[in-house]
UniProtKB/Swiss-Prot annotation:
Similarity comment: Belongs to the glycosyl hydrolase 13 family.
Residue positions where Pyrrolidone carboxylic acid is found in the record: Q21
Leader sequence residues: 1-20
Protein's recorded name: Alpha-amylase-related protein
């Protein structure tokens, strides 16, 4: 009986720990993550203090923090070819990283690190040099900066059949040397690396290529991690937030359902389907059942996004900054509809798949510069600084914990809905105007449309909508307007 009771207690503790790994540890009502892709640590620290904190963002996903191979031309993907766990990259060193984490935590912005647990660098002719000065010989699986040797890896093989679990989880993803996560030594080094980041104050991890690792191995690693550091404002016994890259289109041998109990999972179907809808390949009226009604993961297990650093570079349905009107409409819907753990993208301009981040003649990443309206220049796109996007971050904060109601559509590509009595969104993706008296569910008054303008000193710089005593307002979105959405909320009442 005692053994049975002990087993039950252990199971309950494990289940509680796993559920805790779905908690992103946001401040207050904040609830949007931004991926500042390839930014330097010092620039992220300043952005937390000067923009993200004041605009109500909740957290930042940062690029991989550990030493990587130096590749000719410095393509972005060199960050995904690690050679040690030393915290020196093109974004900065360990001291700069620690300073950034502290400064961001101090203003309520949590830091989530993109971590590479699946592999080390792929083949390189001869001895390769890393960003922290380490030398390595990937072709022989020699990584003395860790150290790893050939015995710490799975035998080399190529993934030719994506329906073969063995190949997916034990062969080399695009030639990257595949670590054996069942090895005690490998586990110890990965746990040591992640615990060091926790000590520095991070709130959690985006686990790259999670589907290429056995869920049981990841479960062991996650459960062995330290609690978050209370010196950075986390409560006692808080577990790191974990979201895992698992590409699952619904017919995969390795399924997202193997990982969603361990932490959140990147819901790639969300990205693909929202792109299809706002590209006009699927009527917006069908979005009324968005979320689990579309076969997506439960809301609290789904990390949602319009695009990410990988799929924004692919051809297909996925939207990116190069289709700005549709992209902003899709993002407005993403942040207004109550589904998922939301992440927005902040990109740099690219002409091909391998384009490096903005850099100088010495191949050092340059800091973003800003125009008079706060937008980025010099090669950085900074979608998170587009008013239409950061305003919807504020909208999402204002309507937190409310449900969707009063859905309206025209049977095609014009839609609107309320978020309780706190917010209202309308979208027009037709080639003709939306002009309609619609239920906004808001208290009577005049409201600033935060898509077309901002509330400044009690006045709206864009469109405004008068809401009557019954909650109705006249909504107009012209087909030729710069933006195809209109958003009102209680914190934007004039």
């Amino acid at each position: 009986m005692f053994k049975f009771a002990s087993a039950v207690i252990l199971c309950l503790v494990a289940a509680s720990s796993t559920q805790a790994q779905h908690n992103p540890h946001w401040w207050g009502n904040r609830n949007t993550i931004v991926h500042l892709f390839e930014w330097k640590w010092s620039d992220i620290a300043a952005e937390c203090e000067n923009f993200l904190g004041p605009q109500g963002f909740a957290g930042v996903q940062v690029s991989p923090v550990n030493e990587n191979i130096i590749s000719p031309g410095r393509p972005w993907w060199e960050r995904y070819q690690p050679i040690s766990y030393k915290l020196t990259t093109r974004s900065g060193d360990e001291q700069e990283f620690g300073d950034m984490v502290r400064r961001c935590n101090d203003v309520g912005i949590r830091i989530y690190v993109d971590v590479l647990l699946n592999h080390m660098s792929g083949d390189f002719d001869g001895i390769a040099l890393g960003t922290a000065g380490s030398e390595t010989e990937p072709s022989t699986k020699s990584f003395p900066g860790v150290p790893y040797t050939a015995q710490d890896f799975h035998p080399s093989c190529e993934i030719t059949d994506w329906n073969d679990r063995f190949q997916v989880q034990q062969c080399e993803l695009v030639g990257l040397k595949d670590l054996d996560q069942s090895s005690d030594w490998v586990r110890s080094k990965l746990i040591e690396f992640l615990d060091h980041l926790i000590e520095l104050g991070v709130a959690g991890f985006r686990v790259d290529a999670a589907k290429h690792m056995a869920a049981d191995d990841l479960s062991y690693i996650y459960s062995s991690l330290s609690d978050l550091n209370i010196e950075h404002g986390f409560p006692h016994n808080a577990r790191p937030f974990i979201f895992q890259e698992v590409i699952d289109h619904g017919h995969e041998t390795v399924s997202r359902d193997e990982y969603n109990q361990l932490g959140a999972v990147t819901e790639f179907r969300f990205s693909e389907e929202i792109g299809n809808a706002f590209r006009g390949n699927n009527a917006l009226k069908w979005l009324q059942s968005w979320g689990t009604g579309w076969g997506f993961l439960p809301s609290g297990q789904a990390l949602t996004f319009v695009d990410n650093h990988d799929n924004q570079r692919d051809m297909g349905a996925v939207l990116n900054y190069k289709s700005p009107k549709q992209y902003k409409m899709a993002t407005a819907f993403h942040l207004a509809y109550p589904y998922g753990i939301s992440r927005v993208m902040s990109s740099f301009a690219f002409d091909d798949h391998d384009t490096a981040p903005p850099q100088d003649e010495q191949e050092k990443i340059i800091s973003p510069e800003f125009d008079e309206e706060g937008g980025c220049v010099n090669g950085w796109i900074c979608e998170h600084r587009w008013r239409q996007i950061y305003a919807m971050v504020g909208f999402k904060n204002a309507v937190r914990d409310t449900e969707i109601s009063d859905w309206w559509d025209n049977g095609d590509n014009q839609i609107s809905f309320c978020r309780g009595n706190k917010g209202f969104l309308a979208v027009n993706n037709n080639l003709y105007d939306l002009s309609q008296e619609l239920q906004t569910c808001l208290p009577a008054g005049v409201y600033c449309d935060v898509i077309s303008g901002s509330l400044v000193d009690g006045s709206c710089t864009g469109k405004s909508v008068t809401v009557d005593n019954n909650g109705y307002g006249y909504i107009h979105i012209g087909s030729d307007e710069f933006d195809g959405a209109l958003a009102l909320h209680v914190d934007a009442k004039i």
